[in-house]
Regions:
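Sec-dependent signal peptide cleavage junction
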Residues: 1-17
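Short beta-strand elements that form the blades of beta-propeller/WD-repeat-like
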Residues: 16, 49-65, 100-114, 153-160, ...
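Ordered hydrophobic segments in well-structured contexts
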Residues: 73-74, 84, 98, 106-108, ...
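Extended alpha-helical regions
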Residues: 150, 171-249, 275, 281-283
Length: 352
């Protein structure tokens, strides 16, 4: 699915990109100064990868001294309550858990085994603590790339069915029924108003189409498409009020964020794992300094056109808040794989 990519530039420093596109630059502390500090649970190594609107972080965890057994866990950022949800079934030492979607009532996650190439998707219902298997797929790619969108009691899961072919499956949470609604190679499903929007990807012709699938009658309509290998859609995202496109431009190796009417918001040399919630956009991009070792994260206020200069760890957004990882030392001094330890960083949480 992801072979449609612009060639990324090497790090050259992009701190001034916002000045060229009409965004005011501010220190990230101006926005995040009221964030509360939340240490990691004692005796646990917890890696938060998803944030719900009710202030609960979800991710993979292990108990220190028992790193061979990982599990899905949650942490209430208001009460600091830490909860184990499910142990990972260790079919090999390369079995991990990836959180695909969280809401106030459900969690969708995958346990994947890179060695045996198996992956199982689960639905966790929070209120009654019930677990349902949604998908059992074999074989899988080495790293799962799964996106989930929701409309009321229907889930739309985009996942690999084999040979780099990604399809979209609809699951009914009330009846348990499911059906394939897009069998062609596709990605980036987003529910916006009364439609499911997604990108149809032809990796042979190197073209992309944006498809609108009606949630009321199931009709599909192509609303936009690229016609050559110089420009193509590589992501869609919504905050519930606006729909954004991420466009790759091979001519100048750039990525452009546009709105649904193709009004350009800004361009950058690299943008991955984008999250758009409320008025904020974050993504992983080009390192702003040659001294930076770990991934560089960006934070933008699209409503007030502010680029917050941010130099700490991963960022998670919800409609109501932000969870960010504050480094306690230079990123180059934190050993690989040891960010989420109390001696190296602290979780910071703030609601809007």
């Amino acid at each position: 699915m992801h072979t449609c990519r612009a060639t990324k530039k090497s790090p050259s420093g992009s701190a001034n990109v916002s000045r060229k596109i009409g965004f005011e630059e501010r220190k990230a502390e101006d926005l995040l100064k009221n964030s509360i500090s939340i240490p990691y649970p004692d005796g646990k190594i917890f890696t938060p990868t998803a944030l719900s609107n009710d202030g609960i972080a979800y991710g993979e965890a292990v108990d220190q001294g028992h790193e061979d057994q990982n599990y899905l866990a949650s942490m209430n950022l208001h009460t600091k309550e830490f909860q184990k949800i499910k142990d990972v079934e260790k079919t090999s030492n390369l079995t991990h858990v990836a959180v695909s979607y969280v809401d106030h009532d459900i969690v969708v996650f995958e346990e994947y085994d890179q060695l045996n190439q198996t992956g199982i998707y689960y639905l966790w219902k929070i209120k009654d603590k019930s677990l349902t298997t949604l998908i059992d797929r074999r074989p899988i790619g080495t790293v799962p790339v799964t996106q989930v969108a929701r409309s009321n009691q229907k889930l739309f899961i985009n996942y690999e069915v084999g040979d780099s072919l990604y399809q979209i499956e609809e699951f009914d949470l009330e009846t348990g029924s499911h059906q394939t609604i897009e069998s062609k190679n596709s990605g980036f499903p987003n529910v916006f108003k009364n439609y499911l929007y997604y990108v149809q990807i032809d990796n042979t012709a190197l073209t992309t189409k944006i498809v609108a699938y009606s949630l009321s009658d199931g009709q599909k309509k192509v609303i936009d498409q690229t016609k050559d290998d110089q420009r193509y859609y590589v992501d869609l995202m919504t905050n519930g009020h606006n729909l954004l496109y991420l466009v790759a431009n091979n001519k100048d190796a750039s990525f452009t964020f546009e709105n649904k009417n193709h009004k350009k918001i800004f361009s950058t040399s690299q943008a991955e794992t984008s999250i758009y919630r409320n008025i904020y956009l974050t993504y992983m991009g080009e390192r702003r300094s040659e001294e930076r070792v770990k991934s560089q994260y960006y934070l933008w206020d699209l409503k007030h056109r502010i680029h917050y200069l941010y130099d700490h760890g991963p960022i998670l957004l919800s409609d109501k808040g932000i969870l960010w990882i504050q480094f306690k030392k230079k990123d180059s001094e934190i050993p690989k794989g040891e960010i989420y330890r109390n001696e190296n960083s602290v979780m910071r949480y703030q609601e809007w």
